[in-house]
């Protein structure tokens, strides 16, 4: 018997056979190649599956959709899994499948276990995913958390759909912000010896900077000490800290490098980078967000990748020189303005690093490359696509997914975040307050491009209104039924239950069976659309249906055949909830 999870393919095969028959009869021309779309119906009165095929082909057939639907239905070969086919509305074709097709899904789930829902849809295809990639200038904040949860879930879904996924974090260990970080740590270190030294206005000011500085002092003593006077002597008098705080900050960074020299500056720099990067790694690992590689920006320079990118763009005629700098002719490829690749001092820009990093990704031969950025990176999209064309790479291989930052609320008060100001709420603080499970689920339960108001009180509540609690509670309730079974004289005979699945005839049972059968399709859709919220919504529906069933029926009944069938059914529900939550990075507790 055909499993419900493969029923759509069976119906598609039947429709293709019907189309070929209509071509033979001259109803359709031989060159007609329809795209057959089959959907689950939302109302059982309209059957189990439906297609709009007649509506899409009516023009080619030269007849009304309803008339063509009649001919398609007449041409359908018989099937033992379909009990009825009807035409609805202007020409929709509805299919009613046998109850046995639904019941078979239980045996399929219990046989496959944790692998149920996995497919080979993406077999042989390699996907590169980059997500989070926050600058290692401070702890991850709650805004980064959404990108982390989303990226990890998309990677899990693609893996479940058969794709080979490479997860990567791009470490921005070069550039201006890292210089400011090293300066911030150094000034805090100096304050341990000379309290009169003030931290520049726009430096990083969080407590974590002080912690790094104290560790530096404990390990190296006064090795990096310089007096206030020696520093001030290095700051040009014409730079006003109030009028131009950024220029003043850059002057401090230059002074630090001059006074410390390359070796000591690198020591301070590396201490700051290692401390923060290790914290980020630990934070993400605790959040079940893992990577195959942490790719440092410095590697681009070390391995000549930036120069390789420049040479390739030059070869294709997209580089020119102006005012001593080297520019990318971005406007010729759809960008709003041309971009500097190398400054007049010979140093590469962030843009040059972006070019080199994407060139490296494309050179690895991936079938898909996925970049997950914050929504504030919207302007990067035409820029990146432009330089890919300039490099001679296929832009269609790149998928840029934008994630709106989550907005955290305490009551009705919005919490502001500022990395340099040090007033942000960290991802770790959020996780400790609401738990990993709630954080993971709340982050992905809406479309990534939708704004997310993170309700702390709801996330912590143990109520039906808390979606992750409600789903986990369904799993725990099923575990409780099987624990109760062990305290009775009754048994659970799984093979006998399989033989009596036809006894699952109540509306609640039919509803659960239909929803269970949709799971493999949900995984495929969620993977192909990079949409973990589809799985989250599915699990909410399944949990709601189970709770309704639990409140309406009893499971540990005297009737052996019905008891075993029902226990098999709820065991299948338990398995699907556990499988789905695992893909979302959420636990499935046995007790709550």
Curated annotation (Swiss-Prot):
GO cellular component annotations, sorted alphabetically?
A: cytoplasm
According to its UniProt record, which reaction does this protein catalyse? tRNA(Arg) + L-arginine + ATP = L-arginyl-tRNA(Arg) + AMP + diphosphate
- InterPro entries (UniProt xref): aa-tRNA-synth_I_CS, Arg-tRNA-ligase, Arg-tRNA-synth_N, Arg-tRNA-synth_N_sf, ArgRS_core, DALR_anticod-bd, Rossmann-like_a/b/a_fold, tRNAsynth_Ia_anticodon-bd
Among Pfam families, the record links this protein to: Arg_tRNA_synt_N, DALR_1, tRNA-synt_1d
UniProtKB keywords: Aminoacyl-tRNA synthetase, ATP-binding, Cytoplasm, Ligase, Nucleotide-binding, Protein biosynthesis
Classification via Gene3D superfamilies: Arginyl tRNA synthetase N-terminal domain, HUPs, Isoleucyl-tRNA Synthetase, Domain 1
Q: Name one GO biological process term.
A: arginyl-tRNA aminoacylation
Tell where it localizes: Cytoplasm
Molecular function GO labels: arginine-tRNA ligase activity; ATP binding
- Source domain of life is Bacteria
Asked whether the keyword DNA-binding is assigned, the reply is no
Q: What Enzyme Commission number(s) apply to this enzyme?
A: 6.1.1.19
Q: Motif 'HIGH' region: which ranges?
A: 134-144
Describe its assembly. Monomer.
Among NCBIfam families, the record links this protein to: argS
Q: Which family does it belong to?
A: Belongs to the class-I aminoacyl-tRNA synthetase family.
- Record protein name field: Arginine--tRNA ligase
Where does this protein come from, organism-wise? Answer: Coxiella burnetii (strain CbuK_Q154)
Gene name of the encoded protein? argS
